[in-house]
């Protein structure tokens, strides 16, 4: 995981670092997600279904997509903090995602504007991993951006 100091965080800096060995990249999407109070929980899921080409890439392929998640407000358990199951892209957790022990494998992210919650190779952690949002009791705003 790449940790970038809070004051110097920049989406393009992160993408440049991840794609330095494979060449150019494009900022392909960006959106702001708002989780409203008492929103229903979103269960663990894998975002790779959104990118079918990833299913045909060998494990040795360079990262094709990097998704960055930045909380615009503090992400807490009460307002729906995202959890990531690291290494879940390897498929070992596929049949146990909802099973016992999942909380011990899940890492919660972050504080408002905290780049350490976003400046990682999300191909391995978030995009091919899983996320979960608990019932929100107040607003949570997240910025998502993808480079490919």
Curated annotation (Swiss-Prot):
Instruction: List this protein's GO terms for biological process.
Output: terpenoid biosynthetic process
Gene3D superfamilies with a match to the protein in the record:
q2cbj1_9rhob like domain (2.60.120.620)
Q: In which pathway does it act?
A: Secondary metabolite biosynthesis; terpenoid biosynthesis
Q: What keywords appear on the UniProt entry?
A: Dioxygenase, Iron, Metal-binding, Oxidoreductase
Binding-site residues for Fe cation, renumbered to this chain:
45, 47
The enzyme's first-digit EC class, named in words, is oxidoreductase
Can you provide one Gene Ontology molecular function annotated for this UniProt record? metal ion binding
The record's listing under SUPFAM superfamilies reads: Clavaminate synthase-like
List the Pfam families hit by this protein, alphabetically: PhyH
Q: Where are the transmembrane segments?
A: none
UniProt EC number: 1.14.-.-
Cofactor dependency: Fe cation
Q: What does this protein do?
A: Iron/alpha-ketoglutarate-dependent dioxygenase; part of the gene cluster B that mediates the biosynthesis of austinol and dehydroaustinol, two fungal meroterpenoids. The first step of the pathway is the synthesis of 3,5-dimethylorsellinic acid by the polyketide synthase ausA. 3,5-dimethylorsellinic acid is then prenylated by the polyprenyl transferase ausN. Further epoxidation by the FAD-dependent monooxygenase ausM and cyclization by the probable terpene cyclase ausL lead to the formation of protoaustinoid A.
Q: Quaternary structure per UniProt?
A: Homodimer.
The UniProt family comment states: Belongs to the PhyH family.
Instruction: Report further notes.
Output: In A.calidoustus, the austinoid gene cluster lies on a contiguous DNA region, while clusters from E.nidulans and P.brasilianum are split in their respective genomes. Genetic rearrangements provoked variability among the clusters and E.nidulans produces the least number of austionoid derivatives with the end products austinol and dehydroaustinol, while P.brasilianum can produce until acetoxydehydroaustin, and A.calidoustus produces the highest number of identified derivatives.
Protein name in the entry: Iron/alpha-ketoglutarate-dependent dioxygenase ausU
Q: Which gene encodes it?
A: ausU
């Amino acid at each position: 995981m790449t940790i970038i100091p809070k004051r110097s965080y920049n989406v393009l800096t992160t993408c440049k670092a991840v794609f330095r060995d494979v060449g150019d990249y494009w900022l392909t999407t960006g959106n702001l997600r708002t989780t409203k109070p008492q929103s229903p929980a979103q269960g663990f899921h894998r975002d790779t279904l959104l990118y079918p080409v990833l299913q045909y890439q060998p494990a040795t392929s360079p990262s094709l997509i990097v998704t960055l998640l930045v909380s615009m407000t503090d992400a807490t358990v009460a307002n729906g903090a995202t959890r990531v199951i690291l290494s879940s892209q390897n498929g070992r957790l596929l049949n146990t995602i909802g099973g016992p022990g999942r909380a011990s494998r899940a890492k919660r992210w972050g504080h408002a504007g905290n780049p350490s919650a976003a400046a990682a190779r999300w191909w391995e952690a978030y995009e091919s991993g899983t996320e979960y949002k608990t019932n929100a009791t107040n607003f949570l705003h997240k910025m998502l951006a993808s480079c490919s």
